[in-house]
Amino acid sequence: MWSTTSCRMGLLLALLGLLSACDDKPQQTTARNAVPTDPTLAQLYDSSCKLCHANPASGAPLTGDSQAWSPRVAQGADTLLDHTLNGYNGMPPMGLCMQCSEEQFLGLIGFMAGVHIQ
């Protein structure tokens, strides 16, 4: 039969196991399932940006990766927009979104970077 000490030890281990599963950090949305709240931007993101910015193998900064986006955002909206419109390194001109307006590009960049871009 179980002794009182064994029961307490078992209960303590079970409790510690449950507590170790708790995490006070909010769950981050992964690049693969992130979607803008604006329906138009969501469609544009899905049809053009997502191909590279949700694929770690592409080398593009991943959607929601603030560490990767931070130095880019620090360059300012004009530079980000210029790189988007004209292409930069492996990014094709217009990010393959020929129908996107500059305002939409800024909205998409802001969504991917996790900041408001003006």
Predicted regions and their residues:
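Bacterial N-terminal signal peptides that target proteins for export
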Residues: 1-11
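Short Cys/His-rich Zn2+-coordinating modules
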Residues: 29-36
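Short sequence/structural segments immediately N-terminal
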Residues: 38-46, 117-118
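The canonical Cys-X-X-Cys-His
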Residues: 45-55, 108, 112
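Axial heme c-ligation environment in periplasmic c-type cytochrome domains
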Residues: 61, 83-116
